[in-house]
Amino acid sequence: MKYLVVLLSFLLVTPNASKPLFEEEKTELCNDGICVVQFNAKFNAANEVTWLDDLTDCSTATVDIMADPSLPQDYKIVVVPTILVLEDGEEVARFQANIMMTMEATRDEVQESIDNIIMSKF
């Protein structure tokens, strides 16, 4: 019993024990301001957005929602792929796939949301 208490105490005081892994990545990714994150899953790799790296004036990342079971709930991901545009870590735009899990939003539409964020600072 004493060992169980020690083990539980260790788990409770371990830093970032309950912090989702993506939170650390998001902090680093969005450090420069605007970042675009595609949430997808391996089972839907055929519908992955391929133009994400073509976006300008932002950082980009693709995250597998199966890697962290809390991601769909934390980010309200109901269909994949879902693209979030984040400014300083906060969601400012969301683009979701249709019922066939195909992204209908275009690169130009996502880029426009990025450009609007930049223009709003002037």
Specify the residue positions occupied by each region the protein language model found.
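Extracytoplasmic/secreted cell-surface and envelope-processing proteins
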Residues: 45-48, 72, 93-95
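Sec-dependent N-terminal signal peptides
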Residues: 4-12
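N-terminal post-signal-peptidase region of extra-cytosolic proteins
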Residues: 65-70
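Structural micro-motif
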Residues: 75-87
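Non-catalytic, surface beta->alpha helical segment in thiol-disulfide oxidoreductase systems
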Residues: 85-122
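N-terminal leader/targeting and pre-domain segments
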Residues: 17-32, 109-122
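Local sequence-structure signature of Cys/Sec-based thiol-disulfide redox active-site neighborhoods
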Residues: 21-57
